[in-house]
Amino acid sequence: MASASTENGEELMNYGSNSDSEESEYSENEDTQVCDKDSQQNSNADSGYPLDSPELQDSKTTGQKGQNKSGKTSIGAVHPNYGFGKRWSKSEDVLLKQLVETHGENWEIIGPHFKDRLEQQVQQRWAKVLNPELIKGPWTRDEDDMVIKLVRNFGPKKWTLIARYLNGRIGKQCRERWHNHLNPNIKKTAWTEKEDEIIYQAHLELGNQWAKIAKRLPGRTDNAIKNHWNSTMRRKYDVERRSVNASGSDLKSSRTHLITLIKSGGISKCMNNMQHNKESGGEAVNKSENADGASVTAVKGGDLAQESQDDHQKGSNLAHLSMQHLIKLTMPRQTPIILKRTRKHIPETHHQAGCSSSETFNQEEAAGNARSRPPSSPVISPIKSLPFSPSHFLKSPCLTTFEDMDLRASTPVTKVYNRVGMEIKKEMETSSIETPHKSQLGPRTPTPFKKALAAIGKKRDGRRYEPSSPSSLVEDLAEIIHEEHLSNSLTANNSKMMGAADQNSTLSTEYNAQSPPHMKRARKSLLSTWSSNHPYNAGSAKRIQPFETETPSKFLTSPGDILKDTLCSEQDLPFDEGRKENRPFHNRRINKYRGGLTYDHVIDPKWARVACGKSRDQMFMEEQAYACLKNLSCISRSLNFEKQKCLVNSFDRFGSL
């Protein structure tokens, strides 16, 4: 009874079972990419029991009948989906192994221990997955020869019968081995472009139904086609498919938007606006600046009484315009604010004398309405320019604008009014944070003048000096420079009365003590006259200091003594912070050494003899050195080290002598 049920179950369930565990267990090294075609179509492959298996369909039919002839209700009759779609757990596998070890393959006793499984499910789980006698390794040459021989005898469909002659193999393994590797009708050559095209077109129609695709390619198995698609073709054709889908979605969205605008009455409003412009006959502006600075030309209307016939003809021509003419009037794409450059404001030109006052009033009223009209809350963003004409037509300014349709979107945008007479906002040319132009800056005051003005402010008890006129400022500065010049001349006269021996140190000390501050010396460069021109120097024979003279290049007729005084010695130079010779302490130390030390030009002959190496011992050592060098230069190099040692010893003896 048990053996009969086993044969029937194996015969019925052979093509239906497709668990992943089985597939991984008996797959060969060369079959690593092999998968069963049924595993793709069944989502419950891991359970080992597909929904379309014959025996499970039989159980459904029995469940629909209700009861058996014996009158007892079966499990499948009460629960038509009993145990389906539920994977086997590890605990169930362990329990099944223990029960088989205890009771053997007696499924009538083992089956009731699994409340959520049918007896046939338990039997198939053991026979196809858990049986330790199953061979799940690679196929041998003997097994392949046996499969080929059995297929010739029984045909390529009796896989359960063929599996009985192969110990450890089941019918599914034999079937996959034959169809994927052993069948002589299988093509194992490289894939051609024609086959790739057939697979691509079939995949577009059928999807992943590899068995149906294999029927269109004789000599190729479904498994080989699937592996070729996943490994090679998907990367190549997915990019093309995405581009086709993207262009199709754009075309679909543009068509939908066009239909929406047509239904909302945009075209009818466009024609009404054109008719209204023809009847009103106002004057249009010759050129108007739009958002991007592009000029749009319009018709200039003159006297209505004289040109009524021409306007009528023009209006009739506008009524018969095609869409291609309307595309030329499309509003250009607005430049983002962050990319706009500051433009200088161009004043509006006056209207010509021939324009009537009523026409001017109409234009101002239209511009005022455009400015006073507030932008509504977020409206839909303007569509981007597409390569075909519907989008250009929809962006025409004469059509119903998106703002008038009150379409809401997540991104708020500002309205772009393309009205005649619309004024452009004047942008600020300068800002407080911008650097002003050089021409706008006032004259800069030189540093010596600033210091002189600060000195005048000190004399005025800290009050700021404000001259009444430029001439008074010059007079005050000349007075300050004159006073400083007198003080310096007195200091120089006093310094000349010092003794000749201490002249250098005394001059530097007196100069550092009584010389004017550093900031006052800069003002002496402002003297515009030489000492000969000053009245207080006319009767005195005072020597002009070098720092009191002007630059010689400014006075080409300067006397020679002034130029001579300009190139003075170091001791007559003004105090310089960077020169150590002008410091008091340094000067005193130098003068002390100059006055106390006396240089003797006569050299002691004994000291010269020792210093120049002319003593007796030095000359003896020099002769020995010359002798050693002379002997060593004549000896050729050799590899006889003992000979060299003898020479060295002889030299040592010669040196010791």
UniProtKB/Swiss-Prot annotation:
Q: Does the keyword Transmembrane apply?
A: no
Which domain of life, per UniProt?
Answer: Eukaryota
Localization (cell) = Nucleus; Chromosome
Q: Which keywords are on file for this protein?
A: Activator, Chromosome, DNA-binding, Nucleus, Phosphoprotein, Repeat, Repressor, Transcription, Transcription regulation
Q: Which residues carry this modification: Phosphothreonine?
A: 445, 447, 557, 566
SUPFAM superfamilies, from UniProt?
Answer: Homeodomain-like
Q: Which residues form the HTH myb-type domain?
A: 87-130, 131-186, 187-237
Q: According to the UniProt record, list the residues that bear Phosphoserine.
A: 381, 389, 396, 558, 569
Compositional bias of type Low complexity: which residue ranges? 371-382
Concerning SMART domains, the annotation shows: SANT (SM00717)
Write out the ranges of the annotated region (Disordered): 1-78, 348-382, 429-448
Q: Name one GO molecular function term.
A: RNA polymerase II cis-regulatory region sequence-specific DNA binding
Give the Polar residues compositional bias ranges.
59-73, 354-363
Q: Answer yes or no on keyword Secreted.
A: no
PROSITE patterns for this protein: HTH_MYB
What are the Acidic residues biased-composition ranges?
20-33
State what this protein does: DNA-binding protein that specifically recognizes the sequence 5'-YAAC[GT]G-3'. Component of the DREAM complex, a multiprotein complex that can both act as a transcription activator or repressor depending on the context. In follicle cells, the complex plays a central role in the site-specific DNA replication at the chorion loci. During development, the complex represses transcription of developmentally controlled E2F target genes.
What is the annotated quaternary arrangement, including any partners?
Component of the DREAM complex at least composed of Myb, Caf1-55, mip40, mip120, mip130, E2f2, Dp, Rbf, Rbf2, lin-52, HDAC1/Rpd3 and l(3)mbt.
Identify this protein by name.
Myb protein
Its lineage opens with: Eukaryota, Metazoa, Ecdysozoa, Arthropoda, Hexapoda
* Gene that this polypeptide is encoded by: Myb
